[in-house]
Amino acid sequence: MRAPLLLESRDYLLSEQMPVAVTNRYPQETFVEHTHQFCEIVIVWRGNGLHVLNDHPYRITCGDVFYIQAADHHSYESVHDLVLDNIIYCPERLHLNAQWHKLLPPLGPEQNQGYWRLTTQGMAQARPIIQQLAQESRKTDSWSIQLTEVLLLQLAIVLKRHRYRAEQAHLLPDGEQLDLIMSALQQSLGAYFDMANFCHKNQLVERSLKQLFRQQTGMSISHYLRQIRLCHAKCLLRGSEHRISDIAARCGFEDSNYFSAVFTREAGMTPRDYRQRFIRSPVLPTKNEP
């Protein structure tokens, strides 16, 4: 298997002293699997796409945040009007006496520890910081170099305060409409999602919520739910021995034949063929071995 493309620091940071850079992806195009000489924070503002991080697929959209380590490998596929910012940084170039280890990964051994959601309020606070950070990181004087690190610290604190796990939005004190619906959808991977009941419970207008969701993500609510269910199915096909019919049920598909048809249409291969890609072939002995 060919090694992933390596993105080098010198192609993104103006000098060997500059610790931070911002690359605006307006829009983010399909990008092959790659790794880096630096770390990055990815914040999605609009649209949607498939983000494959360390072989784990995520259907990403407005408000998704990823902390990417240098050794991680990831790619972007099936993008639709995907708008995001990459905040690139080199940990070894950070000199402020800050508790970076509590603000930036590694945060723990969990596979999805680098994936978070950002509240609507958090997005509003983060955006002007990123804009200023982008301006300062294009300069090479010593004051700008120091200011970029200060701005990165400010951004890291804002993200720490306003990030949450997708399935825990209901714990937020002031849940915004988009945060609430995202949480509910994440908790409905294997069960029926009752839109009318959700809106009644949270005192929301169904039509307005659907319009807001499509405006921010570029998808309907039902399409997004189907996409995250398919991403969950891919994870189960790769990492479990469950029967395909059981996986279909775990991902909200009552009919396994319908699941196979939808999966094949979206992935370009059947669930069985997809699973076969990740089954290692046994090593056969050579002729000289007993």
From Swiss-Prot:
Q: What SUPFAM superfamilies is this protein classified in? A: Homeodomain-like, RmlC-like cupins
Q: Where is this site: Interaction with sigma-70?
A: D246
**Which PANTHER family does the record match to this protein?**
ARAC-FAMILY TRANSCRIPTIONAL REGULATOR, HTH-TYPE TRANSCRIPTIONAL ACTIVATOR RHAR
Q: Gene behind this chain?
A: rhaR
- Complex and partners: Binds DNA as a dimer.
Protein name per Swiss-Prot or TrEMBL: HTH-type transcriptional activator RhaR
Q: Which GO molecular function annotations are given, in alphabetical order?
A: DNA-binding transcription factor activity; sequence-specific DNA binding
Q: Its function?
A: Activates expression of the rhaSR operon in response to L-rhamnose.
